[in-house]
């Protein structure tokens, strides 16, 4: 549904405008003291309505292309949506503590596996 601009199996769930608003950075530039972690809300990552948004891949420090959005949950679970490459990823694990490189590794391996001309970094 998120990848298809609010439509799932031919049924409109959310308007395209709602999806655009969800993906749009709602926070803007934040001073370093207001940032949640050293990764979240840096100059390349914003926060939309429900997930982190990649505003600039080069500044984000993440392997996700500009325009992608993502979020994680407890024990290392996470998902991401990459509209440019028409790709979604869902990673389910139960790893405590989850401060590992699994997310970066998964993103890197995914994009490395699809190295043909379809991938637009």
Language model region names:
Residues 1-121:
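Catalytic loop of the DD-peptidase/beta-lactamase superfamily, centered on the K-T-G motif
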């Amino acid at each position: 549904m998120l990848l298809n601009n609010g439509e799932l199996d031919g049924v409109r769930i959310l308007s395209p405008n709602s999806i655009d608003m969800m993906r749009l950075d709602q926070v803007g530039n934040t001073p370093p003291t207001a940032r949640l972690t050293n990764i979240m809300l840096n100059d390349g990552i914003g926060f939309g309505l429900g997930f982190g948004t990649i505003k600039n891949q080069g500044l984000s420090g993440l392997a996700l292309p500009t325009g992608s959005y993502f979020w994680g949950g407890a024990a290392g679970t996470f998902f991401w949506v990459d509209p440019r490459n028409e790709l979604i990823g869902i990673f389910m694990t139960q790893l405590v503590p989850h401060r590992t490189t699994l997310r970066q590794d998964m993103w890197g391996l995914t994009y490395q596996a699809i190295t043909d001309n379809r991938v637009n970094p």
